[in-house]
Amino acid sequence: MRSIIVAFYLLLYAIVSLPLFLIFYIIGKFSPSKKAYLSQKFVNNFGFRPILFLSGVRLTVKGRENILQDQAALYVFNHRGFYDILAGYTTAPYPTAFVSKKEIGKVPMVSRWMKYMNCLFLDRSDIRQGLQTFSTIIVPLTNNFMIS
């Protein structure tokens, strides 16, 4: 039953997202950092958190006070499934950009939100491209973005 509810919510989320892509695109023309921040807030508060709630997931975070809030950091999430990604993202501070495998960059709506949130896509089969991706991480870190 929960699967059906989550699927229905994802459909509703996709419908609501369509006009927001345009709105956030326009915002990004004037302030790219504002677009990234608002995109992260929307995806987190109206995407990931409700999906976790509807799925019956309850998170308990210990040591949140140890998470850096005002300086750049690199977080590495060791995840085995998609829910680990949702749980990790909802606990990360803003602004946070993520590194994801390049295959996720081919999923239409997901890749758009990830690009809006300054996420990077990593080709795990090409070592040179992977090193190039990691060298681009330096730029967001110098702008006080968190990287996960």
Model-derived features: positions:
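A transmembrane-helix-recognition feature enriched in membrane-embedded lipid enzymes
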Residues: 1-60, 112-113
